[in-house]
Amino acid sequence: MRLLSLLTFSLFAVIGLAPAAQAKDTLTIYTYDSFVSEWGPGPKVKENFEKECDCEVNFVASADGVALLNRLKLEGSKTAADIVLGLDTNLTTEARASGFFAPSGIDQTNVKVPGNFKDDIFVPYDYGYFAVVYDSEKLPNPPKSLKELVEGDPAQKIVLQDPRTATPGLGMLLWMKSVYGDEAGAAWQKLQKRVLTVTPGWSEAYGLFTKGESPMVLSYTTSPAYHMVVEKTDRYKALAYPEGNYLQIELAAQTTTGAKNPLAKKFLAFMTGPGFQDVIPETNWMFPAGKTSKPLPAAFDALPKPEKTLLIPPYEVAKNRRLWVNEWLAATSR
């Protein structure tokens, strides 16, 4: 019995002296839900970066880009986020003013987007143009302009996203303001008759559309490429409007917390190269903003090209966003 006790003690002593398994360094990325879905870029981006960094990537999802910024403001300096991925240029002035983001410190030579957007904090990773996407089997004669969309048949419904939580919803708000100016409130009143519902994020809206709940949805000119490549159908189409289509440039940035984690800067640099950019066209269904190692899928050649690009300067969006959201609320709640 005494011998057994001695052997047992010796075994625990050896275990206690054995070196603990080395825990991998972790990078926490806040992003939107469609990015981390099984069909989104997240899984492949995670796999590619983890091979390069020998680390663990932890994605934390919110409904959409505006919700990401709102969450970070609530968490403040106590946030667990090293990187926030999914903001866009419409939010940069407000995000910078929060004081929760740090300069990227990376070379952005490979980054190229319409308008040559450059920023010391916010790094573009993709871009696209907002568009009305429609089901050609249910709607053979869709609205051919924003004016026709606003003033058309109320029986032909569209699903939109909330500008308070979703960057596409904010994009639609700014699209309407770009075209209608001071008459945007009146235009929203007319359009409201066609709105089936307003969802918190893009995923919910597009899901309702593909389930047949509505023949139209606010999405991107690139969205039909998914259906062409994956589903082998050209049933779903996007529209380029003569008034122009509103541009979205999606961005990522490291937080002030993340700036203390060397993996954050490493990820931002990785994001501008093929390991990230090659994943974007056929998972996020947007145009890549950085260096790729292969051409775009052939389906992208069939997509409509905007006749005019619309984009309100970030400082003007920051100055007026609350006012314009209230205008939308007042017009659509009547």
Curated annotation (Swiss-Prot):
List the record's Gene Ontology CC terms alphabetically.
Answer: outer membrane-bounded periplasmic space
Does the keyword Metal-binding feature in the UniProt annotation? no
Q: Where in the cell is it found?
A: Periplasm
- Which region is the signal sequence? 1-23
Question: Sorted alphabetically, which InterPro entries does this protein's record hold?
Answer: SBP (IPR006059), ThiB (IPR005967), ThiB-like (IPR005948)
Q: Where does thiamine bind?
A: 64-65, 166-167, 202, 220-223
Give the Gene Ontology MF terms in alphabetical order: thiamine binding; thiamine pyrophosphate binding
Q: Which GO terms describe its biological process?
A: thiamine transport
Entry keywords, A to Z: Periplasm, Signal, Transport
Residues annotated as coiled-coil are none
Write down the superkingdom of origin. Answer: Bacteria
The primary site where this protein sits is: periplasm
Show the NCBIfam families listed in the entry. Answer: sfuA, thiB
Assembly = The complex is composed of two ATP-binding proteins (ThiQ), two transmembrane proteins (ThiP) and a solute-binding protein (ThiB).
What does the UniProt record say this protein does? Answer: Part of the ABC transporter complex ThiBPQ involved in thiamine import.
The entry assigns this protein to a family as follows: Belongs to the bacterial solute-binding protein 1 family.
Put simply, this protein is called Thiamine-binding periplasmic protein
Specify the species: Brucella suis biovar 1 (strain 1330)
